[in-house]
Amino acid sequence: MEYQIKYENGIANRGCLYRLKKVMDRAKAGEALNIAFLGGSITQGSLSSKPELCYAYHVYEWWKKTFPQADFTYINAGIGGTTSQFGVARAEADLLSKEPDFVIIEFSVNDDSTEHFMETYEGLVRKVYTSKTKPAVLLVHNVFYNNGANAQLMHGRIARYYNLPAVSMQSTIYPEVVAGRIENREITPDDLHPNDAGHALVASVDRKST
């Protein structure tokens, strides 16, 4: 089903796109590139019917289809039920050791909207952004579809401080649910984790709101 999402509303922070452009230029040149994802259960692919239908794999597939001359490797470092506090502790082993060139970070429904988690999220973002490969980083804010809650207010401060692009489901998909144009059970069985249709929708916001 095609949904009429206002993708322009999904830009939580425009940020500097210089690194993203550099990765795309390298892809056009046919280089080998690592496309990586770090987050919680949604990134892991929870409730997608198979791993290839989670939002992260959809984004990876977009890179492959858009730049067929390049050699891409998919790195999914999502672990369900984890926050950015655990994310920063495992970032080196699970993500940075694999030398990513493009990274999506997704913890806005795992972290609470508190100063503590703003600090742990900032530590994670800084660790990834300043790592050896200097990857392009995209911050993704998922949302609870029953009440619109997430940690975007706190996480958004970090996006602005580091001038990083960030996209939001709170301002794209959630308003459509509230308005009744999308039935929540069409995209999520539990008001949080997307089903296959929901994962595809999240991936479309990731791509089109950047």
Task: Name each model feature, range by range.
Residues 37-38, 106:
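Structural cue for short, hydrophobic secondary-structure segments
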Residues 31, 54-75, 80-82, 86-208:
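Alpha-helical cap/lid subdomain in secreted, periplasmic
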Residues 41-44, 109-111:
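A short, flexible beta-alpha/helix-coil linker loop
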Residues 38-39, 140:
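Short hydrophobic segments within beta-strands
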Residues 1-37, 43-50, 61-70, 194-209:
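N-terminal secretory targeting modules
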